[in-house]
């Protein structure tokens, strides 16, 4: 597939419900804090904070979710086409 990259600006408290992708997704936290979790149900108490400079690679098919803490900007990249499938 072709390489893609895009920025997402997330206001404080933005929630991204459980979902998965057909391809590996790379996330680079540009500013703010992104809370991330793995599983089929969003559980804020089990989320891991990623701060500016953190880079994670999320394997294809892994059920995950996220939430911003404060205004947050992330860069998402990978080899497309990117697909997003909700868990529920």
Residue ranges with predicted function:
Residues 11, 34, 40-61:
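Short acidic-glycine-tyrosine-enriched beta hairpin
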Residues 1-4, 47, 88:
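A short, N-terminal "cap"/entry segment at the start of jelly-roll beta-barrel domains
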Residues 16-18, 36-37, 58, 63-69:
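Short beta-strand His + acidic residue motifs that chelate non-heme Fe in jelly-roll/DSBH
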Residues 3-5, 22-24, 61, 69:
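Extracytoplasmic
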Residues 11-14, 21-41:
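Glycine- and acidic-residue-biased ligand/ion/polar-headgroup-sensing regions
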């Amino acid at each position: 597939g072709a390489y893609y990259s895009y920025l997402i600006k997330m206001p404080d408290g933005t929630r991204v419900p459980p979902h998965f992708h057909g391809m590996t997704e790379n996330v680079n936290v540009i500013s703010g804090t992104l809370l991330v979790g793995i599983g089929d149900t969003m559980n804020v108490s089990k989320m891991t904070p990623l701060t500016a400079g953190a880079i994670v690679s999320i394997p294809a098919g892994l059920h995950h979710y996220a939430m911003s803490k404060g205004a947050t900007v992330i860069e998402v990249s990978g080899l497309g086409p990117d697909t997003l499938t909700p868990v529920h």
